[in-house]
Amino acid sequence: PFEQFGAPWLKGPELAEHLNGHGLPGVTFRACAFTPTFDKFRGESCEGAFLHVTDERTFDPFVTGIAVFKACHDLGGPNFAWRADAYEFVEDLPAFDLLCGTGRVRQGIEAGWSLEKIVGGFEAERKPFLPLRARHLLY
């Protein structure tokens, strides 16, 4: 799951080129087209990108995830919208903030910050976390 993403209003080649332009380590993006069979865009033709991990040792899912949402936001213009209804029985927080554990990622994206600035805002928290997670990695 979550290897392929898109929306009816995105252009797959543009999205893939934009994401590949970041030069993110251990990942490449390929344009794709699909028609979801469930959920938000069920039955609608969508374009997007397929995320292909090329080197699991250098791949950074945290940075990649932020890059994906920032690209969809930036390229989607007025068509892009964060989920506004209740999620996991929580009504007072946007779903994206709940999943991220903070509103800082969304706020940075909305403010037009660069990917580097958004990610850099978490460096002090990430640095001690990375060694702790190492023993739990499967690959």
Where are each of the predicted segments found?
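Conserved functional hotspot residues or short segments at active or partner-binding sites
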Residues: F2, G6-G121
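Charged phosphate-binding loop/patch that engages nucleotide di/tri-phosphates or the phosphate backbone
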Residues: R135-Y139
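Short amphipathic alpha-helical coiled-coil/interface segments
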Residues: F122-R126, L130-R133
